[in-house]
A protein has these predicted regions:
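Short phosphate-coordinating micro-motif centered on Lys-Gly-acidic
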Residues: 41-47
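A small-molecule sensor/coupling module
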Residues: 22, 95, 113-155
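Phosphate-/nucleic-acid-contacting segments
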Residues: 154-221
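Cyclic-nucleotide recognition modules
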Residues: 73-131
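Short, small/polar residue-rich loop motifs at catalytic or cofactor-binding pockets
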Residues: 28-29, 47-49
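Glycine- and acidic-residue-biased ligand/ion/polar-headgroup-sensing regions
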Residues: 39, 50-63, 78-80
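Cyclic nucleotide-binding regulatory module and flanking cytosolic helices
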Residues: 1-38, 87-90
Length: 221
């Protein structure tokens, strides 16, 4: 695990921990590294899990799919991001999401039950870890609340403007990249891609934004 320490150090989950403490925790919870090719499923809806995933490299999409193949993207996970933690922390919980590799990826699987069970000596770094996990879960709730704000808008135009405005504020710039391609953005906002493309074209003609692929430049005029 030594080679992944640069990634682990930058992860909010390990905030305030030394390299030795991080390695000790990984050993304590029997952390396991897996690799998955693009398009493969890490978690499938209908299953249950005792582990959560930490992205070491590559990216995954957290999605919901119906029987007819309609896809709703809940979030995208890149290096240093987590997925599956609410389900792993709830014994017997059935996944209503799937996690699929957007590209070849390496993932660290962590047993949440062991993470939530303090060591016999109640080691200080384990207590820090539990506090960090609570913070990670709280941040995930905020992200989902933000998505609800976007998709609760009545029109495709309003959903786009809500999302792009939030991204601009989050990145503190009127010029920014988003983590989605056009189809993924449509799936994330729960709109039809064709209708979204029409609205983006209108917004450009109105001078409210300029976009190319996943790059956007907003105008406040």
């Amino acid at each position: 695990m030594q080679k992944y320490l640069p990634v682990l150090r930058s992860c909010p989950f390990f905030t305030g921990l030394t390299d030795d403490e991080i390695l000790s925790i990984l050993h304590c919870v029997s952390a396991a590294k897996i690799t998955r090719p693009r398009g493969s499923y890490i978690f499938r809806a209908g299953d249950s899990t005792e582990v959560m995933g930490l992205m070491l490299s590559g990216s995954t999409l957290v999605i919901q799919e119906d029987l007819w193949g309609h896809r709703n993207i809940l979030s995208k996970c890149s290096t240093g991001d987590f997925f599956g933690e609410p389900y792993a922390a709830t014994p017997g919980a059935i996944l209503n999401i799937s996690v699929v590799a957007e590209e070849d990826c390496e993932i660290l699987l962590l047993n949440v039950k062991r993470l939530l069970t303090s060591c016999p000596t109640a080691c200080d770094h384990h207590q820090k870890l539990i506090r960090n996990l609570v913070s990670v879960l709280a941040n995930k709730i905020l992200l989902f609340n933000e998505k609800i704000t976007h998709i609760s808008k009545r029109t495709t135009r309003e959903k786009l403007l809500s999302y792009l405005s939030a991204e601009s504020i989050r990145q503190a710039s009127l010029s920014f990249d988003i983590p989605f391609d056009r189809q993924q953005l449509a799936d994330f906002l729960c709109v039809e891609r064709a209708a979204m493309s029409v609205e983006l074209s209108k917004l450009q003609k109105e001078g409210l934004l300029v976009t190319k692929r996943n790059h956007f430049e907003l105008s406040t005029r």
